């Protein structure tokens, strides 16, 4: 049995068309949803500056903070992870009197002053390194998510020293 070149080309085009349709349907079916190992939210972190306005009613700390590296991730299974390296006061490169931090996750609108959740507190090492890993309860819907890294005091989380975002 021999297949003409015309029939072979037609068969290959049909297979390609069916494959494209299957892949597009599969991609469309998961739009707006995330696979088990995906991420719902991820961002870099930036230190605060004196010009920062309150975010969700939380004031920035009284002095600027910088960091070498910072990331935050939230998975669809509720796994929250925040890492900071070198989160220190801009003026002197130390953590000053700050020894503990927490991370608050907020959703819009900005007038919402109650976080969806707060993770931590965890120790902030003298070199400004810290890591928070927690399983959290996810909000059912979240628009414009923002994470604030906050000074943890005896009364709970206070001012923010870093937030989700970037600098150029």
Q: Language-model segments: which ranges?
A:
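Bacterial N-terminal signal peptides
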Residues: 12-22
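Helix-rich interaction surfaces within compact, conserved domain-sized segments
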Residues: 112-168
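Bacterial N-terminal signal peptides that target proteins for export
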Residues: 2-12
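Short amphipathic, basic-aromatic surface patches that mediate peripheral association
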Residues: 86-94
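Transition segment at domain starts
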Residues: 31-76
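Short coil-to-beta strand junction motifs in C2/discoidin
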Residues: 94-102
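Sec/Tat signal peptide C-region and signal peptidase I cleavage site
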Residues: 23-29
């Amino acid at each position: 049995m021999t297949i003409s070149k015309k029939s072979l080309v037609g068969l290959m085009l049909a297979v390609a068309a069916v494959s494209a349709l299957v892949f597009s349907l599969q991609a469309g079916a998961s739009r707006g949803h995330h696979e088990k190992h995906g991420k719902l939210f991820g961002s870099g972190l930036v230190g605060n500056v004196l010009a920062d306005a309150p975010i969700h009613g939380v004031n920035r700390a009284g002095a600027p903070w910088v960091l070498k590296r910072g990331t935050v991730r939230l998975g669809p299974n509720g796994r929250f992870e925040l890492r900071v390296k070198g989160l220190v006061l801009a003026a002197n490169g130390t953590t000053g009197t700050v020894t503990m931090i927490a991370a608050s996750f907020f959703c819009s609108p900005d007038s919402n002053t109650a976080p969806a959740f707060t993770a931590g507190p965890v120790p902030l090492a003298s070199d400004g390194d810290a890591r928070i890993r927690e399983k959290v309860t996810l909000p059912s819907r979240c628009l414009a998510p923002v994470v604030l890294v906050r000074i943890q005091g005896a009364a709970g989380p206070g001012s923010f020293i870093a937030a989700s975002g970037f600098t150029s």
